[in-house]
Amino acid sequence: PNANAERTPENYCSVSKSTDQAMGRVRELLPEKRRKDAVLAVEYVMTASPEWWKEATPRQQAEFFARSEQWLEKKYGKDRVVAAVVHRDEATPHLSAFVVPLTQDGRLSAKEFIGGRSKMREDQSTYAESVKKLGL
């Protein structure tokens, strides 16, 4: 177990306040017709180095999480980000977010949604740019 139970109360949900609420949002977005093996959500884990977390002020930490969530919403659309949970009970704080991989034409396609290596590299660069002001 990596989580420190004493710090679990410091965790919080900024999108969907419960698993049931998040699943309800997923169901609302899903197309009626879909493959049985379709990926329903893609998880993003967003964090910084342990050293940064030790030096960052509470304000910088809050801004990191806000900017991370904003990056996801700008890239994929606010409606597709169905859950975002800040975990502060582990050695390195992080945001765990779930995004429904809908294509522009309303299909579920994680492959098309995520893209290939070059698109993933581009995503890493644009994300890095979004948190650069925080010294990252």
Question: What are the language-model segments listed below?
Answer:
Residues 1-136:
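N-terminal nicking endonuclease/strand-transfer module with a His-rich metal-binding environment
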